[in-house]
Amino acid sequence: MSSDEKLQILYCSFCGKSQHQVRKLIAGPAVFVCNECVDLCNDIIREEEIAQAGGAQKKLPTPPEIHRMLDEYVIGQEFAKKVLSVAVYNHYKRLGNQTKKDSVEISKSNILLIGPTGSGKTLLAQTLAKILDVPFAIADATTLTEAGYVGEDVENIIQKLLQKCNYDVEKAKTGIIYIDEIDKIARKTDSPSLTRDVSGEGVQQALLKLIEGTVASIPPQGGRKHPQQEYLQVDTSNILFICGGAFADLHKIIQRRTDKSGIGFAAEVRPKEDFSREASKLIKQTEPGDLIKYGLIPEFVGRLPIITTLEELDEDALMRILTEPKNALVKQYRKLFEFEGVEIDFREDALKAIAKRAIQQKTGARGLRSIVEHTLLDLMYDLPGVAAGLRKVVIDSGVIDQASPPIFIYHHEKASRKVAQE
C-alpha cells in the first residue's frame, strides 16, 4: 500500500479502528467516531440511568392505595382486590428489604385466582403490574409442555418477561407473570399418573421450580438453545407468579366435603340461579385439599399459598364495567367517534342489552367488546363518509338487538333514524 493510500484511510479517534473495520465512521471537527464507539457510549449512559433509577426507588403504595388504584380499572371483586393488595404489598416490601441482614427469611407468596371466564383475573394482574411499574408477561398453561416435547417450554415464560423489559435481567427479576388456564393442566384423577402426562402433571412438575425459585437459562434475544451459546441467567426467586383458572365443577368437590346439600329423592329442587349462587358461595370455601382432588399435585398447590376467588359478574356489574373504569368501552368508542367529529350516546337500555347478551353467552366482561364491535360495525364502516353534518349517534336497545337502526341527529335536525349503508 502506498503512502498516499495510507493517508486517505480514516480511523476512529477513540478506538483506533479504520474505516474498513467498522460499519460507519462519523466525522466531526478534526475527529472521527465509529458506530461501535457510539453504541458503547449509549450502553454506558443507559446503565447509569438504570443505576440512578434503582437508587431512587419509587415509594411502594400501601394496600389501601393499591386497592383504590385497582378500583379505577376493575369493577367489583372487592375481596379479591383486598387480598391482592396485601399480597403484592408484602411481596415488594420483602424485595425492598432483602439487602438488610436479618435472621428471618421471608418466603415468596405466589397467588392463585379462581373465577369464571370474564370475571377480571387477567385484568387484575395486568393492573397490578401497571400500578407498580414492573414488567408483566402472560402465559397460557394449555400451550405448555415438558422440556423435550413438542410445544412451549415452561422457560419460555421467562423469555416473554425478558422481552417486555428489553432483556434487562435485573428488571425482569422484579416482574409479575400471570399464567392463565392453570386448571387445564390438572391431571384427570387425584392419584399419581402411571403414564407420561406431557401437558398435565408433567407441566405442573416443570413449573414447580420456576415458581418456587430457580436460575433459568434463557437464550439471548429470543434465540433457540444450542450447546455453544451463552445464556442469560435469570433467578426467578423474586418474580411474583399469579395463576388463574375457572376450575369448572370445583364446587362439586367442595360440596361433597362440606355436605351442604342433599342428594337423591330428598334433595331440594332449586332454580338454576340458586345453583349458580350456591356454587359461588362454595367456591369461596376452597381449600388446598380441594385443589388436589381437582387434579393439581400437592407440591404445586403448596407453591400457591394465597388463594382468592372472584365472583361471576352480574348485569349491574357489567353495565358499570361499560362506563365507569378509566378505559371503559363506552369512553373508548366516544373517543373514536370524536375523531370523526361525531358524538355517540349509549342509552341505559342499550347498556342493559349488552350486559344481558354477555351473560347469555357466558363470556363475562371479556365478551363486551365483541358485542359492541359487532353492533357498531356497519356504522363505523360508513361513518367517515356520512360524518359531514352529523352531530350525534344514539344507540338504544333496539340497535343492540338488531331490531332498529341507530338514531342519527344532524346539526339542522332534532332526531331521525337512519339505516347505515350496506
Curated annotation (Swiss-Prot):
Does the UniProt entry include the keyword Glycosyltransferase? no
Sorted alphabetically, which CDD domains does this protein's record hold? RecA-like_ClpX
The gene name on file is clpX
**Which protein family is it in?**
Belongs to the ClpX chaperone family.
The lineage is:
Bacteria, Pseudomonadati, Pseudomonadota, Gammaproteobacteria, Legionellales
Q: Which InterPro entries match?
A: AAA+_ATPase (IPR003593), ATP-dep_Clp_protease_ClpX (IPR050052), ATPase_AAA_core (IPR003959), Clp_ATPase_C (IPR019489), Clp_protease_ATP-bd_su_ClpX (IPR004487), ClpX_bact (IPR046425), P-loop_NTPase (IPR027417), Znf_CppX_C4 (IPR010603)
Binding of Zn(2+) occurs at 12, 15, 34, 37
Q: What is this protein called?
A: ATP-dependent Clp protease ATP-binding subunit ClpX
Which positions bind ATP? 116-123
Nucleotide-binding recorded as keyword: yes
